[in-house]
A protein has these predicted regions:
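Short, low-complexity, disordered segments immediately C-terminal to signal peptides
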Residues: 21-44
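Sec-dependent N-terminal signal peptides
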Residues: 5-13
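Eukaryotic chromatin- and chromosome-associated nuclear factors
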Residues: 41-306
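C-terminal motif of bacterial Sec signal peptides marking the signal peptidase cleavage site
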Residues: 16-19
Length: 306
């Protein structure tokens, strides 16, 4: 009897040890990632990251890389304890000092860390062809811009029109910046080629707000279920991905007489009739219901929201 009790005790001890070992292995293989996610979430300072969106989406950034990021306005807002959801965050070009998995080091007056989801890396060696729409910055000034390629004689340094610059009906208007900076050359390694139908940084989106209106925005980053965007007055916001639609970049689907929604101030709720389409320049002449004619970029008019 005593031998049986001793044998049962040995077996129980062995099973307990095996169970503990199994739990340790599970922790090593699975729970560590959960713990890391919980730790990362716990480390998020709501004042420095008020958006319900990951601080990184797996960006492949490198030390010294040329990027677009709101590295000046973000730091000023943090230092002044401003509400980042109400602050305009203009994306400028700069170079990373040190790339990280969640945040990367940039410099504005001093080195500091910026969450990677607010950083758009620009690859080296990109080439473009006529009609391509690119993400770049205004190279006669500053600030994120989309541009359409007019001349691809040198695919690494194309000549472009800036689609985010205003075009007037009167070509001689002093505010006709699109005409003033037409056929501008881009520096090599300074742009990203955008693709229709892809949820990639720089594309135009329309996201339905709580009032049922379609807010216009530029996509910064996307996950499977959320988008981080740059909206009206350069404010960063988050929407459910299911509430957003990509705005087509190809104007070939537009023709005179088409009824479209056009960007007015901050939304796509104004209705227009297409008068003329300039596919080469990515511009559309439209008239609203009050009889006023305007020139809009191909990113500012659409039929996909009907």
């Amino acid at each position: 009897m005593m031998k049986k009790l001793i044998l049962m005790a040995v077996i129980a001890t062995s099973m307990t040890a095996m169970s503990c070992a199994g739990n340790s292995e599970n922790n090593a293989n699975g729970s560590d990632s959960t713990a890391a996610e919980q730790t990362a979430a716990a480390e998020v300072d709501p004042a420095a990251w008020p958006w319900d969106f990951p601080q990184s989406t797996g960006e492949q950034l490198t030390d010294g890389q040329l990027v677009l990021a709101p590295y000046t306005y973000y730091k000023v807002a943090i230092d002044d304890k401003e509400d980042l959801t109400r602050k305009g965050l203009i994306f400028y070009n700069t170079n990373l000092k040190k790339a990280g998995a969640q945040k990367s080091v940039v410099n504005f007056k001093e080195d500091y860390e910026l969450p990677n989801s607010l950083i758009i890396g620009i690859p080296e060696g990109a080439t473009a062809k006529k009609g391509d729409i690119l993400l770049t910055w205004w190279q006669q000034g500053s600030g994120l811009r989309r541009a359409i390629v007019r001349d691809d004689s040198n695919p690494a340094e194309p000549l472009v029109d800036y689609l985010d610059s205003r075009m007037e009906i009167d070509p001689n208007s002093p505010t006709n910046f699109a005409e003033k900076y037409a056929n501008s050359p881009l520096k090599p390694n300074s742009f990203i080629v955008l693709h229709d139908g892809q949820w990639e940084p720089g594309v135009q989106v329309a996201c339905k707000n709580s009032r049922g209106e379609w807010d216009a925005a530029k996509l910064i980053k996307a996950t499977d279920d959320k988008v981080l965007v740059l909206g009206f007055s350069d404010r960063v916001a988050v929407y459910p991905k299911s509430d957003c639609k990509l705005i087509p970049m190809n104007s070939e689907g537009l023709k005179p007489g088409d009824k479209v929604r056009g960007l007015f101030v901050a939304t796509y709720n104004e209705e227009y009739t297409v008068d003329k389409v300039d596919t080469e320049r990515g511009r559309v002449w439209v008239t609203n219901d009050r009889g006023k004619q305007e020139v809009k970029s191909v990113l500012e008019v659409t039929k996909v929201l009907d």
